[in-house]
Amino acid sequence: MSADFAGSGRNWSQRRLTTGDPEILWERSPTHGGRTIYAPRMTRKQRAEHVLQRLEQLYPQTPVPLDHRDPFTLLVAVLLSAQCTDARVNQVTPHLFARAATPQAMAQVPVDEVEAIVRPCGLAPKKARAIVELSKILLQRHQGRVPDDFEALEQLPGVGHKTASVVMAQAFGVPAFPIDTHIHRLAQRWGLTDGRNVQQTERDLKRLFPRQSWNKLHLQIIFYGRDHCTARGCDGTVCPLCRELYPRRRTPVTWRKG
């Protein structure tokens, strides 16, 4: 729905107008030819639908970024990816998995040896201890298998909700929506959440998007952020999606870190 309304003033403004739909926000453009033009602003749901459509066009295929062989090697790779790039993890894991690629083998490797291998990923002492300890727990409690259960995964050393979500989605195909600071930032720029932390953003995105889209969309947002909407390369007014969702936005978006 669109309409023209008379008005005046130089500044952008937003207002709710009686249009039969109380959810429509109308944005006022600068006057043109003596007239002020009002056009409907997208609702949050409409923005979500636009994001889903555009990302499907841009990224119809979503390969898992972390190289792995099975749920265990994926779990280890995701743990190593904390505060580290996927590219760096993929350089390190071939050396680690050549030494031990199963819980049975990893549980026998001295922690300091694992630490030396994973040092390029950062936080090596903490990550090495977690990898060896979780391998032992998998043997003791789960018959040497990675559990396909959120609660059981989050009880493993070094495994938080985001890591568990990635494993559930990418190893077992269970609908999940892993949220890191990058997805949190883009969701704020795109007006999909008012969340002050990643937990709130996860709840908002799960409400907005169909459950069957979560696993793929998680990766599509990551790929788009890397290619077009980086932390420093876009301020909410630069990349194609930001411009499409907010064509009249002129002020950079200050995002709240989760």
For each predicted feature, which ranges?
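Cationic, amphipathic, low-complexity segments that mediate targeting or membrane/lipid association
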Residues: 2, 27-28
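Repetitive helical segments and hydrophobic/amphipathic motifs
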Residues: 20-23, 32
